[in-house]
Amino acid sequence: MAEKACIKRLQKEYRALCKEPVSHVVARPSPNDILEWHYVLEGSEGTPFAGGFYYGKIKFPPEYPYKPPGITMTTPNGRFVTQKKICLSMSDFHPESWNPMWSVSSILTGLLSFMMDNSPTTGSVNTSVAEKQRLAKSSLAFNCKSVTFRKLFPEYVEKYSQQQVAEEEAATQQTTTSENQDFPQKDNAKVESEKSVGLKKESIQEVGLKERRRNKKEALPGWIVLLLVSIVGVVMALPLLQL
């Protein structure tokens, strides 16, 4: 059972977060347990975590703020082991260094900063930049599978829906562009085919024209034919004139 001072402190911190949100950090208490908070860290630009949304939990002790909370991360991220407590100076791994003045916002800001670092610690893992980027890209889809996440962070669910629509539109546009690029190739092939047929027709016509011209050249002119007919007629008429 949470102590009265603990409840009062956490309620105050939640109001402060709602009034003055912290950059790249969203945190909300569970509707059924004020000691259990759920958070989302947004990956910073210029890092392998850019574009990622990292969901996790903070479990406060009833003695908070005089004792530190436990912190875990649910989203696969390439920096911390999921569902395992993370060792931080602000977590229950180091109660001796805990400062009661630290708040939810300072805890999560510190976690985000430590996430960008590569220093090994209990609960950390070592992965490549490419792996972190891959996990960042798939983080929102992973988170939206959680019923609790969808209930506590509807704005991220809406963001994921918008991403899906945008990806579908981009895929459709890419398909249309690819098809449009194929059409000119088909049209060009058709034009080339028509040109080839046209050239064949022209070639046939030219051959026919040349043949007719050659035949005309080989045929005797009309006046020569007429002269020959006249001569033949005279020759045939000579015997008759002698009678």
Curated annotation (Swiss-Prot):
Domain (UBC core) ranges: 5-162
SUPFAM superfamilies: UBC-like (SSF54495)
TM stretches of this protein: 220-240
Membrane topology: Single-pass membrane protein
GO BP: cellular response to water deprivation; negative regulation of stomatal opening; protein ubiquitination
The enzyme's E.C. designation: 2.3.2.23
Cellular component GO terms, alphabetical: membrane
Principal EC category: transferase
Record region (Disordered): 168-197
A molecular function GO annotation: ubiquitin conjugating enzyme activity
Name of this protein: Probable ubiquitin-conjugating enzyme E2 33
Organism for this UniProt entry: Arabidopsis thaliana (Mouse-ear cress)
